Amino acid sequence: MGVPKKRTSSMRRDRRRAANFKLKPVNVVKCPKCKEPVLPHRACPSCGTYKGEQITEAS
């Protein structure tokens, strides 16, 4: 078995781990009523609807 000759520094270890950490882009859909961009599974901030029902007042 191979054994490391030198200890891996914390900076090198963290840099290697950070290379694989990537944020996923935000999934944005259009509101079926007002066609504004909305995050999925949330009420529309512009018209206040969620799943076709009026939840909050329009802002």
Swiss-Prot record:
One function term, GO molecular function aspect: structural constituent of ribosome
Record keyword Ribosomal protein present: yes
Cysteines joined through disulfide linkages: none
Signal peptide range in chain numbering: none
InterPro entries found in the cross-reference section: Ribosomal_bL32, Ribosomal_bL32_bact, Ribosomal_zn-bd
GO biological process: translation
UniProtKB keywords: Ribonucleoprotein, Ribosomal protein
GO cellular component, one term: large ribosomal subunit
Protein family (similarity comment): Belongs to the bacterial ribosomal protein bL32 family.
Stated name of the protein: Large ribosomal subunit protein bL32
Organism: Anaeromyxobacter dehalogenans (strain 2CP-C)
Gene transcribed to yield this protein: rpmF
